[in-house]
Design a protein with these regions (language model features):
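A detector of single, family-specific signature residues
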Residues: 1-370
Length: 370
């Protein structure tokens, strides 16, 4: 058999398919493997380049292949699909991976270490617990409304609602027992979320990068942890604009015939990162519209000319570029390096009215909601 220079491997729970080519791009290896035989098979091969789709379990297999001396690379599945010639089966997928990884401009996903995977799991478990709590509180409100018991918005009103339910003598005994079960579930979820936040705070204190990123306005500890955990290799991006585009904060491009047509942001990439940056930027824009803080002249100008949501996205895009620079340079955030800083006068900053499409007076801006 000729020397194998590249192998594409399609993974699954139990059955793996490998496709290898030689120096003249001729297929020399087509083999189906059971899960338990994968590592033994690659242990017998000479070190080569192995490509996998960046799906479930891919980071584990990349670590194991690197331990055996191979060069393991992960490819985004959406970049592999165009190379599938015909049909949908494991052999065709493995061949497509092998072909896609040979492209000189192919983008790869950095493989995560076990520690990075555990840290990302911390974020995932937190999100899952918060979703379960939201689902449970909605159920409690819905069931309580059927008995004429309602509560105002917000988590702070859930426990008083449960206390009213417990003391309501008009409720059937069966309903009280079921509400007691829901109350126990809510208390358990509340405790688990508190413990997760404590773990996240401890991770933030022990991570130098996360602490540096938290110094940037609009980021905060949660956003800094998300960035430090999910951006494993900031050097993979050529510029801050590429990083902002990866998060999905750049506009869609529909240009043709020399005419530039830009639309809404792409919303590509990691939704949690984009949400953290946009929410933080929205809070800053609200403060600027009320005449508070010490914004830069650039931000004041954006708030005057653009609707609040658009200004928030523009600020999030700018902050993403600043964060990328901090990650690749190792510097600390220095707010005085920003040019054109401006302290607005007392009172609200006039901004464009979203409905009327013109500049609104300060009083109207202060009363309007972004």
């Amino acid at each position: 058999m000729s020397e194998i220079i590249r192998i594409g491997m399609d993974t699954s729970k139990t059955v793996f398919q490998v496709h290898g080519v030689d120096a003249v791009e001729q297929p020399v290896l087509r083999k189906k493997l059971r899960r338990r035989a994968v590592l033994a098979f690659f242990a017998k091969l000479a070190p080569t380049k192995v490509g996998l789709e960046a799906c479930g379990g891919a980071h584990y297999w990349a670590r194991e292949l690197k331990a055996l001396g191979h060069e393991a690379v992960l490819l985004p599945p959406q970049y592999v699909k165009p190379y599938v010639r015909r049909g949908k089966n494991d052999a065709a997928d493995a061949e497509a991976i092998c072909e896609a990884m040979s492209r000189p401009r192919m983008r790869f996903v950095p493989a995560k270490t076990a520690e990075q995977t555990a840290a990302q799991m911390l974020i995932g478990v937190r999100d899952q617990l918060i979703r379960r709590r939201t689902q449970l509180t909605n159920a409690i409100r819905g069931y309580a409304a059927e008995f004429g018991l309602t509560a105002a918005k917000g988590l702070s009103h859930i426990e008083p609602l449960l206390a009213r339910i417990e003391n309501d003598q008009a409720l059937p005994e069966l309903a009280k027992e079921l509400f007691a079960t829901l109350r126990q579930d809510y208390a358990r979820l509340k405790l688990q979320i508190r413990e997760i936040h404590a773990k996240l705070a401890a991770w933030h204190r022990n991570n130098e990068l996360s602490q540096r990123l938290a110094e940037v306005p609009t980021v905060g500890p949660i956003g800094a942890c998300l960035l430090a955990i999910k951006v494993t290799d900031p050097h993979a991006f050529r510029s801050g604009r590429d990083f902002a585009a990866w998060i999905g904060l750049t506009p869609k491009d529909h240009s043709t015939a020399g005419k530039q047509r830009l639309g809404a942001i792409t919303r590509a990439g990691d939704e949690a990162l984009r949400q953290a940056l946009v929410v933080g930027a929205t809070a800053v824009v609200q403060q600027v519209r009320k005449g508070r803080g010490h914004p830069s002249a650039w931000l004041v100008d954006i708030v005057k000319r653009k609707p609040p949501k658009l200004a928030a996205v523009a600020l999030a895009n700018k902050n993403a570029r600043v964060l990328w620079k901090l990650m690749v340079s190792g510097e600390r955030y220095n707010p005085h390096r920003e040019r054109g800083r401006f302290v607005p006068p007392t009172g609200s900053v006039a901004s464009r009215s979203p409905r009327q499409g013109r500049f609104a007076p300060p009083s109207a801006v202060a009363l309007s909601q972004p």
